[in-house]
Structures are given as C-alpha cells and as structure tokens.
Amino acid sequence: MSENRLKIGITQGDPNGIGWEVILKTFADPRMTELCTPVIYGSLKAAEFYQKTIADLEPVPFHIASSIHEIRRGKINLILCGDETKIEPGTASPEAGRAAAEALHAAVRDLRDEQLDALVTAPIDKESIQSDDFRYTGHTEFLAAELGGEPLMMMCSDLLRMGLVTIHIPVTEISHDLTRQKIVTRLEQLRSSLKADFGIVEPRIAVLALNPHAGDGGLLGSEEEHIIRPAVNEAYEKGILAFGPVSYTHLTLP
C-alpha cells in the first residue's frame, strides 16, 4: 500500500447527534487506515462516551494530536476540539453547537492550508450551531464562504448521481431563485464532477421539472417552458448531453 495515502479530514458534527456513532462504526474496521489517513476533528470525551455506550462496538484506537502537524500515517488521528462539551445524546444545545462549529472551523483551516486532501462532515444541528461565528444555513454555504467558488450539492447512491440547482431555501422561494443561468452553471458543474470524480466519460443528464407533469404545457406552471427548457437547450449547445425537463414521476432507475 502506498505511503501517499490521502489525508481525509472528518468533523465530529454535533456531539449529541449521530456523528460519533457513524465515525466509530466506520473505523472499527482496521482496514480503513489502508485506504487513507483519517484525521478526525472532535472531542475525545465524546468519543470515549460513545465507545462505552454503543453495543457490540470494537474499540477504536486513536492517535491524539493537538494539530495537523502531529498526525501519523496508518493511525486514526484525533485532533482535539470542543472537549469540554457535556454529552447528552439527542439533545440540541448551544454548547454542542459551539463544539460542532469549533471542529468545523479547525478542519477548514487545515483544508485551506492544503494540509488535507478532502473533508467529510458529520451532521450538525443547524439551529444550535448558529452564532456570531456561524451564520449559515448549512455546511454547503459555510464551505463556499470559507473556500470560495460556487458550490454544487449532490446526492449519490449506487445507482443515482443527482445535482441540486437550489439548496437550503424555503420551498416558497424556489421558483424565484430559479434562473436559466443558474441551471446552465449547475449542469456545467455536474458534468465536470461526473467526469472527474466518477469516471463517466460523457454523462447524459436528465433535468427534472419543477412542477407536476413538467407543467403540462403551462397548465401547472410556466417555469418549464420559460426557464428550464431554454437552459437545457443552451447547455446542449455547449456540448453537455442534457435533456428535459423530465417529470420526476417518470424518473426510472435500472
């Protein structure tokens, strides 16, 4: 196995949420360190609490580090953040929100300094994390503000790769936020990601409609004809194999 394993930052998320359970169950398999060098940002107190309370869990040996410069290859590294937080599973609190934000800020600093190759974020509680240092509706917006660039949120399964045009806004605002240029930009981003990250030589992208039955020719909404279809046509002219709008009720998987 190459010594040049990717360094993957992992934030604990809300210490009262599911993040630590997912992290511990993932790294209970010792083979994980053969694939990457994990760097977890979080509370040792929380890690030890969940190690004791989760049934049938193999012990996870952590290498404790105070900074990214103390991590070791082949080890499950834990950079200490928010260790004074009171652990109350399932309970939202400002204290837990601060611990989640502290881990996230520390990881993003190291990512920005090119000390990490990628970042995985455990879930946060979007209400309790709000503070003067964190005024965002989610990880996506925070990372965009800290690292620059236009974010693309994707949802992935074994069969499906789905990019979102709008993110983290009320349903009542979607039609106002939807523009032809935004759709074209998202299609360009999605095509680039599918090629670079998923190895798809030339992806074909179905663009889903906003309204039921793709608007039924304007009877159920005009966004398909006035915004979505022109955007799809423009993207196709740019060499993107996009088609639609397709009614989401017609979306089928192999």
Where are these regions (language model features)?
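Short, acidic/small-residue loops that bind anionic groups at enzyme active sites
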Residues: 131-157
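Active-site glycine-rich loop that binds ribose-phosphate moieties when present
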Residues: 142-145, 149, 171-193
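Contiguous, glycine/small-aliphatic-enriched amphipathic segments in soluble metabolic enzymes
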Residues: 1-138, 181-251
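A glycine/threonine-rich phosphate-anchoring loop and its flanking beta-alpha core
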Residues: 153-178
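A generic structural signal for well-ordered coil/turn residues at beta-strand boundaries
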Residues: 72, 150, 159-161, 201
